[in-house]
Swiss-Prot record:
Site (Interaction with substrate tRNA): T103, R125
Keyword hit for Magnesium: yes
Domain of life from the UniProt record: Bacteria
Catalytic activity: adenosine(37) in tRNA + dimethylallyl diphosphate = N(6)-dimethylallyladenosine(37) in tRNA + diphosphate
Chain positions recorded as substrate binding sites: T14, A15, A16, G17, K18, T19
The name this protein goes by in its record: tRNA dimethylallyltransferase
Family, per entry: Belongs to the IPP transferase family.
GO molecular function: ATP binding; tRNA dimethylallyltransferase activity
Described purpose of this protein according to its UniProt entry: Catalyzes the transfer of a dimethylallyl group onto the adenine at position 37 in tRNAs that read codons beginning with uridine, leading to the formation of N6-(dimethylallyl)adenosine (i(6)A).
Cofactor(s) annotated in UniProt: Mg(2+)
Keyword set, alphabetical order: ATP-binding, Magnesium, Nucleotide-binding, Transferase, tRNA processing
Region spans: Interaction with substrate tRNA: 37-40, 161-165
Length: 323
């Protein structure tokens, strides 16, 4: 192993079994867990995020869970700051940071760094949101393809948050998001370790998912149904009762939450809400797979295998993470 301390990434699509495997690893390795999930950061959003139970979190603490109120925003840049701080603390105690979750942008930002993008502009964002409502997301994707074809190729036409942000960057700065990132990458080469994406760790990257995509779809549908049985609608109803929360916030736009919110607003029937929630979760999983297919050096595990712990330990030994 190089002189860098070790770290483990445990990635994968939603409903693949990442948390269960991570907890098993903490029982046999000197690891501490860091959540890599843009929804788990929010307090009071437990059922719809499939957040580990209070009992599990007490026995197996996860950093970066329940750190924000749902009215607040959380960026990939802030995640990098928080995650690097947590990793440094864990390493200083002689333990291994084990990062687990499915927000692939956060992993990418941690490894490659983020370009310094212009700040959000409320007026521009409101104009783009109005266009999306009036003309549809397809029109926004068409506009993005004209000014930033590289970003348009990366961003799904049904991903409003990223579409709007990419167009916002262009309108505010006059430069595409791709141009910002390319300049940042050029400037970061040769930078000090830990800055601008030169992660000062030797990372073992693992991903877990069923080898049969149909099985993952079944797991997604089952989990969404279980969430509803556990009181997901009441959870969103409690959030909706707050005067400071609305459907445009990143927390409420999280998969599942926006569909239940629309149901409570009377825009969807109960069956439509459940169907759209499952579809949205499947689309999220598809995007996660897309990210993972381009991830260098990832070691895949089958969610249904009974020996994933031993396979993981064997792999970590082979790449000298445990030496």
């Amino acid at each position: 192993m190089s002189g860098k301390p070790p770290a483990i990434f445990l990635m994968g699509p939603t409903a693949a079994g990442k948390t269960d495997l991570a907890i098993e690893l903490t029982k046999v390795l000197p690891c501490e867990l860091i959540s890599v999930d843009s929804a788990l950061v929010y307090r009071g959003m437990d059922i719809g995020t499939a957040k580990p139970s209070k009992e599990i979190l007490a026995a197996h603490p996860h950093r970066l869970i329940d750190i924000l109120d749902p009215v607040e925003s959380y960026s990939a840049k802030q995640f990098c700051t928080d995650a690097l701080d947590a990793m440094a603390e864990i390493t200083a105690r002689g333990k291994i940071p084990l990062l687990v979750g499915g927000t692939m942008l956060y992993y990418k930002a941690l490894v490659e760094g983020l370009a310094d993008m212009p700040p959000a502009d409320a007026a521009v964002r409101a104009e783009l949101e109005a266009q999306a409502s009036a003309l549809g997301l397809g029109e926004l994707h068409r506009q993005l393809a004209e000014v930033d074809p590289e970003s348009a190729a990366r961003i799904h036409p049904n991903d409003p948050q990223r579409l709007i942000r990419a167009l916002e960057v262009y309108r505010v700065s006059g430069e595409s998001m791709t141009a910002h990132r390319q300049r940042q990458f050029a400037e970061s080469r040769g930078a000090d370790a830990g800055a601008n994406g030169h992660l000062p760790y030797t990372v073992a990257s693992l991903a877990i998912a069923p080898t049969d995509r149909h099985i993952l779809h079944q797991r997604i549908a089952l989990r969404f149904s279980q969430m509803l049985e556990q009181g997901f609608v009441d959870e969103v109803r409690s959030l909706r009762a707050r005067s400071d929360l609305h459907a445009g916030l990143p927390s409420i736009r999280a998969v599942g939450y926006r569909q239940v919110w629309d149901y409570l607003d009377g825009h969807l029937t109960e069956n439509e809400m459940q169907e759209r929630g499952i579809i949205a979760t499947r689309q999220l999983a598809k995007r996660q797979f897309t990210w993972l297919r381009g991830w260098d050096g990832v070691h895949w595990l089958d969610s249904l295998a009974c020996d994933n712990l031993s396979r993981t330990l064997k792999y970590l030994g082979a790449v000298s993470i445990l030496s």
